From Swiss-Prot:
Intracellular or extracellular location(s): Cell membrane
GO CC aspect terms: plasma membrane; proton-transporting ATP synthase complex
Protein name: ATP synthase subunit delta
Function, as annotated: F(1)F(0) ATP synthase produces ATP from ADP in the presence of a proton or sodium gradient. F-type ATPases consist of two structural domains, F(1) containing the extramembraneous catalytic core and F(0) containing the membrane proton channel, linked together by a central stalk and a peripheral stalk. During catalysis, ATP synthesis in the catalytic domain of F(1) is coupled via a rotary mechanism of the central stalk subunits to proton translocation. This protein is part of the stalk that links CF(0) to CF(1). It either transmits conformational changes from CF(0) to CF(1) or is implicated in proton conduction.
Listed GO MF terms: proton-transporting ATP synthase activity, rotational mechanism
One Pfam family linked to the record: OSCP
Record's signal peptide: none
Keyword Membrane: yes
Classification of source organism: Bacteria, Bacillati, Bacillota, Bacilli, Bacillales
Length: 179
């Protein structure tokens, strides 16, 4: 684990604990998702927030203006990050926090690769099968198109890969023939 991810993980875990204590897990989850999207959409704001020539107070004033509608506890957390010069970790903290929420809820994210877009029924069936396989209550599936698969699907959940693509089957046959 990289040092940055480790540091962000500690902050995310602390925020998650506070959210649980104050019964704000879902509120923080929604607000962090919106916050991350806003940071991604507005690179200039991120540059200002991470600019070393800005004082801590200037950064807090900027954050206060932009984040005025978020939960006060979450805003205080952002101020803490600014005080500790950790504002550049905010997106990673949001990701780690969401993973903790998903773990709590028994939810996992899955990427499904296919040659053509899958129907809702197919995605639902895959979700049921793989949620059971992963001991999860739900899978959030993102369908990606990958023409190189030739047919079938490849499912990626965390570090696990389930590859039932025609491309892989052909490669396996080729290896068996050569052996």
């Amino acid at each position: 684990m990289s040092k940055d991810l480790e540091v962000a993980g500690r902050y995310a875990n602390a925020l998650f604990q506070v959210a649980q204590d104050k019964d704000l897990v879902d509120v923080f989850s929604e607000e962090l998702t919106e916050l991350k999207a806003a940071l991604k959409a507005n690179k200039d704001f991120v540059k200002l927030l991470e600019n070393p020539t800005f004082t801590t107070e200037q950064k807090k004033n900027l954050a206060s203006a932009v984040f005025e509608k978020i939960n006060p506890t979450l805003r205080d957390f952002i101020y803490l990050l600014i005080d500790r010069s950790r504002e550049d970790y905010l997106s990673v903290i949001a990701d780690v926090y969401q993973k903790r929420v998903n773990d709590l809820r028994g939810v996992a994210d899955a990427d499904v690769y296919s040659v053509v877009p899958l129907s809702e029924q197919e995605l639902t069936a895959l979700s049921r099968v793989f949620a059971t396989k992963m001991n999860k209550t739900k899978l959030n599936i993102q369908n990606h198109i990958d023409k190189s698969l030739l047919g079938g699907v490849k499912v990626v959940i965390g570090t696990r890969i389930y590859d039932d693509s025609l491309k892989t089957k052909l490669k396996d046959m080729e290896r068996q023939i050569k052996a």
